[in-house]
């Protein structure tokens, strides 16, 4: 009987991991909410980023993201002061400390967070979505909402 329970528990654990991956967006860690939509956002032609907010640390996070996109994928992104920017980052004070909302539509990406950490995690999610694209130039249209499940980080061994 114990062997049967162990087998059932292993099957449940396997499906718990495999089913979300087979359903589409594979974002690690799994966000609190994902809604996939039809279409893609083309980063090669919508390469302007605009931050509308008052947190200077976010500008450094954006600069690091742009350097990574150029180095990893050859995508040249630029900051822009125009509201017509393809990627728009906005402060949203009602979100938690590290929470974010990422909305990707065919014509615009909107990222909302209340802290630099939230913007950082949102841009890490964007990077994972770019990795999923064969040519590394587009994002799937998607809505992602996430907040940390725990208010602390587990210690890590730095090697």
What annotation goes with each model-predicted range?
Residues 1-5:
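N-terminal secretory signal peptides that target proteins for export/translocation
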Residues 24-152:
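Contiguous, structured surface segment used for ligand recognition
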Residues 7-20:
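Bacterial N-terminal signal peptides
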Residues 157-159:
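Conserved small/polar residues in nucleotide/adenosyl-binding loops
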């Amino acid at each position: 009987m114990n062997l049967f329970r162990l087998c059932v528990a292993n099957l449940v654990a396997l499906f718990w991991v495999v089913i979300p991956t087979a359903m589409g967006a594979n974002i690690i860690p799994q966000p609190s909410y994902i809604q996939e939509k039809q279409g893609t956002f083309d980063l090669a032609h919508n390469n302007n980023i605009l931050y509308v907010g008052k947190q200077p640390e976010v500008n450094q996070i954006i600069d690091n993201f742009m350097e990574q996109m150029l180095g990893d994928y050859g995508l040249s992104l630029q900051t822009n002061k125009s509201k017509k920017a393809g990627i728009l980052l906005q402060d949203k004070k009602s979100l938690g400390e590290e929470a974010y909302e990422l909305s990707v539509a065919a014509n615009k990406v909107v990222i909302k967070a209340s802290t630099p950490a939230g913007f950082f995690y949102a841009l890490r999610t964007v990077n994972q979505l770019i990795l999923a694209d064969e040519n590394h130039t587009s994002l799937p249209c998607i809505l992602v909402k996430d907040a940390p499940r725990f208010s602390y980080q587990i210690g890590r061994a730095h090697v």
